[in-house]
């Protein structure tokens, strides 16, 4: 379990610090439990302002990984091959966008045709607000909204003219949740999806530890970076879940060699195209 999974509750209610610490200890994550026990609290709850500030620092550090892995360029390269034909507007939706680094990078380089609208969606309102502020300050043609991207009417209005992407999201889902993740996109009838996540292997785990020790300063970032690599789903699990959840899509995981991997391949995409 990653510490960031516990910093905010789905309901928006304050998080009881002692409960978060106890949960981590029950899972044998004593180091993570100690890290959480040192976070600021008010009346037994994690201090909301301090937690939000920590979340922003963590995601700013996470952008370093996106820059190193050239995610903006790589996502744009794949999305260009998935865009529906015709000159009508197409919407590219980044689910779990965080600070919107991927879309902001694409917008800054104008790597997709003018008919493409870039929209980032995240459940965390603090991250969405900061993503919107950054886009505005950088003068970028992309926007960010808070909510569940797969709820009808939130952001996907015309599935046939929509491509859904994400980066580093799927490992936050339990194996039993993956079917529903893909099924939600199929129900909306999206033209295609491309979800980047960690390819689990010895090299990715070792690389995550080295990178986060060298480039990250927050204890939470260092812990969660390695945990992300350890909990990532193998290609077989993703393919099976996508096949069950989105049977009308042609699915593939574009994965390099595990024994002679390229550094950029540590995050590889699962791509689905509606038949």
Where do the protein language model's features map onto the residues?
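Class I SAM-dependent methyltransferase SAM/SAH-binding core
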Residues: 93, 99-151
């Amino acid at each position: 379990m990653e510490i960031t999974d516990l910093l905010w509750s789905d309901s928006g209610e304050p998080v009881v610090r002692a409960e978060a610490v106890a949960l981590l200890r029950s899972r044998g994550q004593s180091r993570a439990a100690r890290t959480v026990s040192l976070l600021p609290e008010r009346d037994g709850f994690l201090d909301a302002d301090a937690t939000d500030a920590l979340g922003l620092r963590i995601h700013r550090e996470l952008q370093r990984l996106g820059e190193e892995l050239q995610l903006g360029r790589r996502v744009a390269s794949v999305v260009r091959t998935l865009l529906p034909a015709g000159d009508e507007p197409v919407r590219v939706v980044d689910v779990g966008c965080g600070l919107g680094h991927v879309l902001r990078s694409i917008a800054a380089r104008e790597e997709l045709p003018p008919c493409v609208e870039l929209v980032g969606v995240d459940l965390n309102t603090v991250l969405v607000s900061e993503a919107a502020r950054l886009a505005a300050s950088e003068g970028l043609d992309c926007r960010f909204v808070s909510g569940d991207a797969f709820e009808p009417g939130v952001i996907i209005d015309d599935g046939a003219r929509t491509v859904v992407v994400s980066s580093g999201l799927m490992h936050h889902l339990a194996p039993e949740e993956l079917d529903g993740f893909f099924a939600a996109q199929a129900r909306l009838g999206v033209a295609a999806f491309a979800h980047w996540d960690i390819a689990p292997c010895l090299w990715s785990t070792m690389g995550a530890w080295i990178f986060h020790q060298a480039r990250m300063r927050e204890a939470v970032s260092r812990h969660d970076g390695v945990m992300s690599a350890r909990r990532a789903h193998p290609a077989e699990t993703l393919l099976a879940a996508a096949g069950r959840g989105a049977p009308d899509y042609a699915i593939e995981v574009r994965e390099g060699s595990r024994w002679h991997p390229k550094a950029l391949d540590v995050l590889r995409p699962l791509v689905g195209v509606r038949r």
